[in-house]
UniProtKB/Swiss-Prot annotation:
The gene is MRPL47. Belongs to the universal ribosomal protein uL29 family. GO terms for cellular component: mitochondrial inner membrane; mitochondrial large ribosomal subunit. Component of the mitochondrial ribosome large subunit (39S) which comprises a 16S rRNA and about 50 distinct proteins. It comes from Bos taurus. This is Large ribosomal subunit protein uL29m. Keywords: Acetylation, Mitochondrion, Ribonucleoprotein, Ribosomal protein, Transit peptide.
Length: 252
């Protein structure tokens, strides 16, 4: 029922777009009156050397790519749509920058289409067919962004030797925390800059006690998480002993 209603909506939109395109094209042809033959052109215009040098009137489609915001008509009315696996970082590292640039726009168009489909399904209060497609596209775009960032970092390290895109240094603030301080250009020297001098890149001696307490708290939280995961693993092994035995045999 959900897929059928979405299919009806998409068919109506496509029919409206086709009707508007045919109407505008007929109006432009009737108004311009560009129907003439090659023989008349050669007789009336002796200075023109060839017909290929003449540029006819061109009009863009009224749809302007709106059909790309909707799914393929073959998938209309289907409850499940087959889709491939998402792109991994290892696969994207083997591609050139030009291929990654093209793939980014392909994924962006696919994401816009799926978001349109998701919004229409929410409007009709119906389930979206194969919602995992949107998750795969998002994962692929995240992996592509990560690969591009890796290449930018490698190029920056080769040219300037800096790890961060913006130069800076590790400093200690007044609370005893180690932070990354980003450098910034100022029109006046640092010793005349009151705003910069208000920053304190040191900690008082009485802060060391609280730094130890913060480290102990972080260590307790980490140990609590590790013990919780171990308890979950033991519980699952007791509840599903056949799975644990199969895992041990596959590892051996």
């Amino acid at each position: 029922m959900a897929a059928a209603s979405l299919a009806v909506f998409c068919r109506r939109v496509s029919a409206a777009l086709k009707a508007s395109t045919s109407l505008i094209s007929s109006q432009t042809l009737a108004s311009t009156g560009c129907r003439f033959s090659l023989s008349l052109l050669t007789k009336n215009t002796p200075n023109v050397t060839s017909f290929h040098q003449c540029r006819l009137l061109q009009t863009t489609l009224s749809r302007r790519g709106l059909e790309e915001f909707f799914d393929d008509p073959k998938n209309w009315g289907e409850e499940k749509v087959k889709s491939g696996a998402s792109w991994t970082c290892q696969q994207l590292r083997n591609k050139s920058n030009e291929d990654l640039h093209k793939l980014w726009y392909v994924l962006l168009k696919e994401r816009n289409m799926l978001l349109t489909l998701e919004q229409e399904a929410k409007r009709q209060r119906l389930p979206m067919p194969s919602p995992e497609r949107l998750e795969k596209v998002v994962d692929s775009m995240d992996a592509l962004d990560k690969v591009v960032q890796e290449r930018e970092d490698a190029l920056r390290l080769l040219q300037t030797g800096q790890e961060k895109p913006r130069p800076g240094a590790w400093r200690r603030d007044i609370f005893g925390r180690i932070i990354w301080h980003k450098f910034k250009q100022w029109p006046i020297p640092w010793y005349l800059n009151k705003r910069y001098n208000r920053k304190r890149f040191f900690a008082m001696p009485y802060v060391e006690r609280f730094v130890r307490l913060r480290i102990e708290k972080q260590a307790r939280i980490k140990a609590r998480k590790i013990s919780l995961t171990q308890k979950k693993e033991k519980f699952l092994q007791k509840k599903f002993p056949h799975l644990s035995e199969a895992q041990k045999s596959s590892a051996a």
